[in-house]
Amino acid sequence: MQNYIKSEKAFKEAKKVLPGGVNSPVRAFNSVDASPVFMDHGKGAYITDVDGNEYIDYVLSWGPLILGHADPSVVNAITNSAMKGTSFGTPTEIETELAKLVIERVPSIEIVRMVSSGTEATMSAIRLARGYTKREKILKFEGSYHGHGDSLLIKAGSGVATLGLPDSPGVTKGLAADTITVPYNDVEGAKLAFEKFGEEIAAVIVEPVAGNMGVVPPIDGFLEGLRELTTEYGALLIFDEVMTGFRVDYYSAQGYYVVTPDITCLGKVIGGGLPVGAYGGKKEIMEQIAPAGSIYQAGTLSGNPLAMNAGFETVRQLTPQHYDVFRSLIKRMEEGLTEISNRHEVPLSINKAGSMFGFFFTDQKVTNFDTAKTSDLEFFRNYYREMLAQGIFLPPSQFEGVFISTMHTEKEIDATLEAFDVTCKMLRG
């Protein structure tokens, strides 16, 4: 039986100085009716909390750690970089090297700008799209979370879905009016929006695989339909690949689905666990950004050497073969979860994409936010706490993706399936 004495004490102290005791809402464990676990260290596929409890980690810092915790090459790259200085506020050669690697692997990107977070990447991409097209409206999809920028925090998923809020106080009516939302995977809904607002829409922003309503892949024709619509109406297509970049495929989601956007937003994996973001695209669009053009964007720590070195070393190590292994392991997980859930008569719907997957306690096929919300949240809460007690660390929200790393093997998958079996038996009696 796990004990969380030190975590509970740490949370009590944190609540004195941090809003809700955390620096990102989902970390508070509110949606699973529990107190957060405070972590101490990680290695490979495992993470250990301050009480000494060890877990198989499927959160992986919410996706960035595709090589697992404390990869020796990444740690070495960060250490060597830090010994030279943590930041200079000037260009460094490693920025160019990481940019070249990103351009080589992401089909849509000819030029890329480094920033410090995924939110900063999507906010900047929206500004760029508006400046480039001279239009103001943005089309996004219900349940898709593109960071906490005001323009995009409209009918968002992830932590917002967990909190039961359709948007956030503080987002002005004017910004909300310039954001059009339609259901994810609904090309016809997007067509209707363009028929009504087509000449005003600057861009469509979409996760090629939704990752903040759980994992929801695109249905056939969805991404292709968006590409056709944006081309027809002169709007830009923005892929938010902050989560899916280098997670879904060696060439990211756009390479896997063979749909090329005008602008791509990246983050997570390209920082190797350090704060990072990036946005890039066609040369003619990206050259509108200052100092090459007049659309302003800047950042004190943009392209900082620690994150650039960590990201370069992470992306450099990834090979196409890694993605074959990811798919094999997740197939093993899917087959095991399905067999166990059927045996215990637990409704379960599973989605997967590359090294990420999601599961919902529902008998419906999950293709959008509405179907994601049919998941049995009370069952999820109880399931989560039991899995945690058995040493399985999952995202503490039904509406988050689950990740594996190059350090996960059949051993970890099988241990997770065994824990799931025990949990289902316990909850179903």
From Swiss-Prot:
**Highest taxon of source:** Bacteria
Residues recorded with modification N6-(pyridoxal phosphate)lysine = K268
Tell me the route in metabolism or biology where this protein functions.
Porphyrin-containing compound metabolism; protoporphyrin-IX biosynthesis; 5-aminolevulinate from L-glutamyl-tRNA(Glu): step 2/2
Report if keyword Cytoplasm is assigned. yes
The reaction(s) this protein catalyses: (S)-4-amino-5-oxopentanoate = 5-aminolevulinate
Q: Which GO terms describe its molecular function?
A: glutamate-1-semialdehyde 2,1-aminomutase activity; pyridoxal phosphate binding; transaminase activity
Enzyme class of the recorded protein, top EC level: isomerase
Q: Keywords, A to Z?
A: Cytoplasm, Isomerase, Porphyrin biosynthesis, Pyridoxal phosphate
Instruction: Give an example GO cellular component term for this record.
Output: cytoplasm
Q: Which InterPro entries does the record cross-reference, listed alphabetically?
A: 4pyrrol_synth_GluAld_NH2Trfase (IPR004639), Aminotrans_3 (IPR005814), Aminotrans_3_PPA_site (IPR049704), PyrdxlP-dep_Trfase (IPR015424), PyrdxlP-dep_Trfase_major (IPR015421), PyrdxlP-dep_Trfase_small (IPR015422)
* Entry keyword Isomerase: yes
- CDD domains, sorted: OAT_like
Location in or out of the cell:
Cytoplasm
Pfam families in the record: Aminotran_3
What's the main place this protein lives? Answer: cytoplasm
Q: Assembly and partners? A: Homodimer.
Regarding protein family, the annotation reads:
Belongs to the class-III pyridoxal-phosphate-dependent aminotransferase family. HemL subfamily.
This one is known as Glutamate-1-semialdehyde 2,1-aminomutase 1
Q: Which organism is it from?
A: Listeria innocua serovar 6a (strain ATCC BAA-680 / CLIP 11262)
The lineage, from the top, is: Bacteria, Bacillati, Bacillota, Bacilli, Bacillales
